[in-house]
Each structure stands twice: as C-alpha cells, then as structure tokens.
Amino acid sequence: MEKQYLTVTALTRYIKTKIEYDPHLQSVWLKGEISNFKNHSRGHMYFTLKDENARIAAVMFAGHNRNIKFRPENGMKVLVKGKISVYEASGSYQIYIQDMQPDGIGNLHLAYEQLKVRLEEEGLFSQVYKKTIPPYAKTIGVITSPTGAAIRDIITTIKRRYPIGNVIVFPVLVQGESAAPSIVQAIRTANEMEEIDVLIVGRGGGSIEELWAFNEEMVARAIFKSEIPIISAVGHETDFTIADFVADLRAPTPTAAAELAAPNIIELQEKVLQRTLRLQRAMRELVHKKEEKLQVLQKSYAFRYPRQVYEQKEEQLDRALEQLVLAKERYIDKKVNQLKQLSFYLEKHHPSQKIMQTKVAVETLQKQLQREMQTLLQTKEFAFVRAAQKLEALSPLKVMMRGYGLVYDEEKQVLKSVKDVSLGDAVSVQLQDGILDCSVSGIEERELNNGK
C-alpha cells in the first residue's frame, strides 16, 4: 500500500477542525496570570496566560475587549471565558477570549482604582485647578436625569433658597452605556452658553454599576476642561466617584449641591437689612457731626461780625497788594542787575576779543619762529663748512698731492706692511693723476720715525 503524505497545512487544518468541533473546547473558563501583554493599535489585545506549570497564547479582539472596564496589565490574575482554536500560520493553539474579569476583585472596582491613580498622577485632582464657586449665581445649570428624584430635589431647594435665580436643566442619561457620552455632551453644551454661572452634575444613589457613568474617563476629562465651575452630586454621602475628585466642589447629595450653588435669600435679606441699618446709623452720625460743626461755625467771630471780618480782609488784601508790588519791583531790579552783569561778562568774553588776542599771539610766535629758524640755519651752515673743511683735509687726494700714493696687491687690497708681499709679486700704485703697475724686486724692512 502506497503511503500518502499530508501537507503541513492540511494537518494543521485537520487539527484545527477537531478542536473547533470539540464542545468542551468551545466554551472554556480559565484563570491565570497575564504576561507579554500587547494592545494593538487596532484595539486587539494579545498576551499569554500562564500558571506555575504551563502557558497558553491568548487573543481578545476589539469587539470583545471594548466592554471591559479595567485595563489588563502584566502580572494581573484574571478569569477569562473563551474558545480554543489553532493559529494556522504558526501551528499553535490559543484561546480566543470573549469575556475577562479580575480574579479576586470586582471588575468595576479595579477599573475605578486604576483610573483614579492615573488621573491623580496627571494632576486632575489637584486643588491648583479648582475653580471658585460664585457666591451669587444668577443662572444655575443642572445636568441630570429629567425624571429622577435628584432633579426634583435640586429645583425645589433652589427655588426655596433663591427664588430669583434661574435654573436651566440639561436632561441626560445617568446610567447605561450611553450615559457617559450624554453627560459629556451636556457639559460641552452648557459651556457654550454664556449666561450659566455654575453647573450641578449628578444623580441619586445606586449601585456601583448604576453610578458607573460618573466613573468614566471621558466624563472626568469633560469636567476638568469645563470653564464653568462644577459641583458634583452623585449618589449618597458615602458614594465617591471619579467625577467627585475632578469637580471643583463635591456635594454629598443633590440637595446639598443645590444649597452650595444657591445662596439663601432669607440670609441675603438679613445681610441687606443689617447693612442698611449700619448705613443709616453711619449717615446719622455723619449728619450729627456736620450739624455740630455748623453750630461751631455759627458761633464763630466771622458769623457774628461779618462787617469787621470783611474790613480786616480788605486791609489784609491791601497789604498783600503792596507787598506784591514791592516784590515785583525788587524782582525786576534783581533781573536788571543780572542782565547788566551778564552783558559785561559777554562783552569781556566776546569772541572778537578772543580772536584779536589769539591773532596777536600767533603773529608774535611766527616772528619768534622765524628768528629761531634763521639762527638755527646759520649755526648749521657754519657747522657744515667746518665739517667740509675737515673732510677735505683728511681726503686721500690731498695726501696724494703732497707726494704720497696707495699701494694695492693683485686682489686690489691696500698694502699696509712689507710683510704683505713677496718678491716678484705684482702691485699697483695709485697716485693723484694715475696708477703705476709695478713688480716687487726687493724688500727692506725698517721703521719710520715721524713719517721719515
């Protein structure tokens, strides 16, 4: 019988078919530890599930993982549900996960803690970014369900405390998958309206699942970016959501949020009354002081004897006018004297006088320079004549005219001693009127006394 060889592809597909048709492998529950976690840009998750003795490749496509609330991380222990199949390209089997939750802690609780840590590290909870709630808001925006008890409590409280205030309700979903986008859109819409002074964002109490929209990251970031101050009012006093940490002010209940947003008109009226009374009291005191001052003035000499006061002032005015005239005359005399002194100074230091003096000085210096140059020239001419006479007396030609000559060897070097030549050497003798070419035929050494 001839053997039939399978291709690798055929064998792999056979094994894959066997696995996929096994009902025990199409609904598998596993628990293990995540490692080699990778979140693909397209949203798919790839990682390994392992325990102490084995490991299996795992895939969770974007269509399934978008529903999980927490972020898978390496080292996290999880419970997963999925099916086993074969990845033909590598011939390896792996689990395709359809659902996943943390092992030992609730899915939502883990997601809550993870987001809380991450946003706190980013600074979204910092007091630096908290906006001040206006004390007298004219218009209050309310973002909540239009049918819940929270909206009734908020509106009732605002109308009771601050009936002159305006309330604008932005109806939203407060639970379910569409709740978070609904809340985010309402916050954006409110920020586009200039008349809103403060926003209340919240709902009544409920389970963590029912309150989860206020733990969504998109809601937290929308609250943080809001230009309008936001008061969070989610659930009961013991409920804390991510929205509470990001909001500018947290109220334990919707009713408390309304009390924080709306001032108490009775208290305001009391304040107005107190300030009115203080103002009236201050005005009475001021009028009383002015009346006392008026009475003092009425009793003064000026009010009792106005004619005498007038005459005194007339006399003081006359004296003041006389002093003014005298002061004017003294001032004019002073300025005239200053003008005379200045004119004398200018005349004395006029440029024409300075130019004339400078011209005379220059002419004097020119004459002095000419005299000194003439004297120097004569001195130099006399010194030149004497130097010329000395040079002429020392000239070799003068010496030759007295019968002397210069003797040169064959190399045209002047002979100064008979020791510089030998018998038969050719020499030349320069006289005043020519040169003699000679030959040494004899040498006699002797010393001359006084040139003889």
Swiss-Prot record:
Q: Which cellular compartments is it found in? A: Cytoplasm
**Has UniProt tagged this entry with the keyword Chloroplast?**
no
According to the UniProt record, one GO cellular component term is:
cytoplasm
Q: Which UniProt keywords apply?
A: Cytoplasm, Exonuclease, Hydrolase, Nuclease
Q: What EC identifiers does the entry list? A: 3.1.11.6
The alphabetized list of GO BP terms reads: DNA catabolic process
Principal localization reads cytoplasm
Q: Which reaction does it catalyse?
A: Exonucleolytic cleavage in either 5'- to 3'- or 3'- to 5'-direction to yield nucleoside 5'-phosphates
Give the Gene Ontology MF terms in alphabetical order: exodeoxyribonuclease VII activity; nucleic acid binding
Per the database entry, which stretches of residues form a coiled coil? Answer: none
Question: What InterPro entries does the database record attribute to this sequence?
Answer: Exonuc_VII_L (IPR003753), Exonuc_VII_lsu_C (IPR020579), OB-fold_nuc-bd_dom (IPR025824)
UniProt subunit comment: Heterooligomer composed of large and small subunits.
Q: What does this protein do?
A: Bidirectionally degrades single-stranded DNA into large acid-insoluble oligonucleotides, which are then degraded further into small acid-soluble oligonucleotides.
Family classification: Belongs to the XseA family.
Q: What is this protein called?
A: Exodeoxyribonuclease 7 large subunit
